[in-house]
Amino acid sequence: MVPAYIPNPVAALCGGGTPIDFCRNYTDGRRILGNGKTYRGLICGVLAGVLIGLVQIWLVGTYHWDLPRQTILSVTLLALGALLGDMGKSFIKRRLGKERGEAWPVADQYDLVVGAFLLTIIFDPAWFFAVVTLPVLIAILVITPVLHRSVNILGYWIKVKKEPW
């Protein structure tokens, strides 16, 4: 899951620039995604996730670590899926009238997992079902909110995020 955990913080660090929705509004008059989802953030986040995934692949191959075997496809799907999940959550938040940065417990913690899992199930189901066993799923569900909160607090302290959630 590391390739899925990396893209969001990297997107926050190097985001900015042109919003993915080009500042357009949806039929309800609200922004489609908002200013927080930019092409620079998307590209940097996905590249960082893929890069960390490639490092994992190299480490497992070189040092024979007992970690799930990743592929270039799996790390790409995990990284891209994480950010697509975040964008999907932002779309729904806007429809519900929630503002950028407004806390949305549970959805804020698991959007990346849902996006990464869905994209991987669609495009690489054999890898997904071989790797994401019940114990792995439980570990992901337990670790993700703790990791999410910790990274957001750090982002708040270093002034990358305006809110610590």
Swiss-Prot record:
The EC number(s) this enzyme carries: 2.7.7.67
InterPro entries: CarS, CarS_archaea
Keywords assigned by UniProt, alphabetized: Cell membrane, Lipid biosynthesis, Lipid metabolism, Magnesium, Membrane, Phospholipid biosynthesis, Phospholipid metabolism, Transferase, Transmembrane, Transmembrane helix
Any one of the GO BP annotations: glycerophospholipid biosynthetic process
Pfam families documented for this protein: CarS-like
Membrane topology classification: Multi-pass membrane protein
Catalytic reaction equation(s): 2,3-bis-O-(geranylgeranyl)-sn-glycerol 1-phosphate + CTP + H(+) = CDP-2,3-bis-O-(geranylgeranyl)-sn-glycerol + diphosphate
Top-tier EC class: transferase
Location of this chain's protein in the cell: Cell membrane
Main location: membrane
Transmembrane segments: 41-61, 72-92, 103-123, 127-147
GO cellular component, as recorded: plasma membrane
This protein's pathway: Membrane lipid metabolism; glycerophospholipid metabolism
Cofactor or coenzyme needed: Mg(2+)
Molecular function via GO: CDP-2,3-bis-(O-geranylgeranyl)-sn-glycerol synthase activity
Superkingdom, taxonomy of origin: Archaea
Purpose: Catalyzes the formation of CDP-2,3-bis-(O-geranylgeranyl)-sn-glycerol (CDP-archaeol) from 2,3-bis-(O-geranylgeranyl)-sn-glycerol 1-phosphate (DGGGP) and CTP. This reaction is the third ether-bond-formation step in the biosynthesis of archaeal membrane lipids.
Family classification: Belongs to the CDP-archaeol synthase family.
Protein name as it appears in the record: CDP-archaeol synthase
